[in-house]
Amino acid sequence: MGGISIWQLLIIVAIIVLLFGTKKLRTLGTDLGESVKGFKKAMADDKSQPQDASFEKVEAKEAASTEQKAKEKEQA
């Protein structure tokens, strides 16, 4: 009763096609599709790179080097 019927949706689509034209709507759809593909690819690339593991390795190296420096100072 309060919803939009299929006929009302068809009328809205027809008005949009008349206003913008099919060529402009096609290019808009293509641009939108490419944007979504790029976003999905970026999200997949972000998940595949384990940033925490490399961060721990750097911390371990820094801790080892500071311990070596402390031992060298004690020996001197």
Swiss-Prot record:
Main subcellular localisation: membrane
Pfam families in the record: TatA_B_E
Subcellular localization(s) per the UniProt record: Cell inner membrane
GO molecular function, one term: protein transmembrane transporter activity
Keywords on record: Cell inner membrane, Cell membrane, Membrane, Protein transport, Translocation, Transmembrane, Transmembrane helix, Transport
Disordered as annotated region, ranges: 43-76
InterPro entries attached to this UniProt entry: TatA/B/E, TatA/E
Domain of life of the source: Bacteria
Biological processes per GO annotation: protein transport by the Tat complex
TM region(s), chain numbering: 1-21
One cellular component term from this protein's GO annotations in UniProt: TAT protein transport complex
Topological relation to the membrane, as annotated: Single-pass membrane protein
Sequence similarity: Belongs to the TatA/E family.
Biological role: Part of the twin-arginine translocation (Tat) system that transports large folded proteins containing a characteristic twin-arginine motif in their signal peptide across membranes. TatA could form the protein-conducting channel of the Tat system.
Complex and partners: The Tat system comprises two distinct complexes: a TatABC complex, containing multiple copies of TatA, TatB and TatC subunits, and a separate TatA complex, containing only TatA subunits. Substrates initially bind to the TatABC complex, which probably triggers association of the separate TatA complex to form the active translocon.
Name of this chain's protein: Sec-independent protein translocase protein TatA
Origin species: Actinobacillus pleuropneumoniae serotype 5b (strain L20)
Species lineage: Bacteria, Pseudomonadati, Pseudomonadota, Gammaproteobacteria, Pasteurellales
Gene label: tatA
